[in-house]
Amino acid sequence: VPRTPQEIFETHGTAIRAGDLDAVVADYAEDALLVTPAGVVRGRPGIREAFAGLLAEIPDATWDFPTQHFADDVLFLEWTAVTGRARAEGVDTFVFAGDSIRVQTVRFTLERTG
């Protein structure tokens, strides 16, 4: 039985909070799309690289996902990630298919604080 979008995102959020890159990437379809202001990343290898960069910018961050609006197979998300040296705030949209994330858009700002 495929997981619901809510279950997939719960797993995804747990992996992000733990900084577990393997678990983060495992939530995506093999041919998933990650759409950012810098362009489109296709597939798990590119998604791994994108998340590795983000997690390196804000290591050991405290993550919060205060706004989560699910509608069918879509999630609108607002998030923050805070460390002793930086704060990131972002807005994402996810599209789920089957048991994974099929498409994600992301836009965030990163502010150095320390």
List each language-model region with its residue ranges.
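Short, low-complexity N-terminal intrinsically disordered segments enriched in polar/charged residues
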Residues: 1-30
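A beta-strand edge to alpha-helix "cap/lid" segment located at domain peripheries
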Residues: 3-4, 35, 48-114
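Structured beta->alpha junctions
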Residues: 13, 39, 67-69
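Short beta-edge strand/loop motif at the mouth of beta-sheet-based domains
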Residues: 41-49
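A short gly/proline-enriched turn/hairpin at secondary-structure junctions
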Residues: 31-42, 57
